[in-house]
Amino acid sequence: MEYRNSLMWKELNEAPAVIADLAAKNACVMEKLAKEVKGKQIDNIYTAARGTSDHAMIYFKYLAETLLGLPVASGAPSVVTMYGAKMKFQNTLVVACSQSGKAADVMEIVRAANECGGVTVAITNDENSPLAKLAQFHLCCFAGEEKSVAATKTFSCQLYLALMLAEALRGGKVCPSLGEALKNAVAAIDAATDPVAKAFLPAEECFLLSRGVSSAIAFECGLKLQETCYIRARAYHSSDFYHGPMAMIGEGTKVILFASKNSLTPETDAVHREDSLKCAEKMTELGADLYIVTDDADAFAKTGAKIVCVPGADSEKLTVFFFALAVQMLACKVSCGKGLKPDSPRALKKVTITK
């Protein structure tokens, strides 16, 4: 299949237009939710999600902890569904994320939080889903039906709703022109991902690295390469990778590093860049076949890595949206180039329900 004929390609390209209208469509609910959270003196956040949705919650965790100073726990629904734990969700905002809104284990977390006085919000792509109805508040992706098994536009929408939520809780606003900026960047990202897609056609394994906000994209890239390309892809926070997994790097091992030009604040830009450079230099020193997805090509020009230069923004919290498109395009191209079907990977269904 030619990748441009796939549903995955069609749907990932719909994300910019959907994002452009997302803030207005969720503004009323977001205002009420922010008021409720402040009124109940919420002092911690708990997220419940699986797969791609959980990667969107990694993004939210970094935003909430850095911008709001609120600790965010990435929940393990099995604690409730398999062990029967009675969680104390008082003074807790529970954010449940599921594209279909049918995740049974995630719903059990919301039910438990509702029963003991927590504030619950669901992020789904279906206003009439069980999860949307169970939570006290619902933020909708409004992405339309997503037919490809691999989630693309819904992931971008989840990221945007996570950003909206973090900004609403601190009294800030989201970038109103992000959708238009993404639309204008599609052609450049398409061209930038061509060389790396060709290089990954024979790949059977690879590692995806990043640190901080962009880690969400590294983990999503790993999942996309696993499910659509059948590549044994493993994602790590680069700081964790040094503690053992780095021993797997040998001559020619494929590694993708995600590194944005700007951090969340100008004060941390230099530290962020230095950390990414350190990681890049270490990977090339070990002989890795390193690709760096970045909006800061000049900073990595001397690392010896292959640069995948994509457009970015003035903050890492926005640049991740451009990285997300790059990851989705890469996976779609590699899958089709391998003669696979990205829209219907083997052994998978569009809706996965775990309990």
Report the location of each language-model feature.
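Tryptophan-centered motif/residue detector
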Residues: 1, 19, 59-62
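Glycine-rich phosphate-binding loops that contact phosphosugars or nucleotide phosphates
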Residues: 31, 38-183, 211, 252, ...
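Alpha-helix N-cap/helix-start motif at coil-to-helix transitions, marked by capping-box chemistry
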Residues: 10-13, 129, 324
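Peripheral docking tails and interdomain loops at the edges
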Residues: 312-355
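Active-site phosphate/pyrophosphate-binding segments
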Residues: 3-42, 137-141, 145-256, 338-355
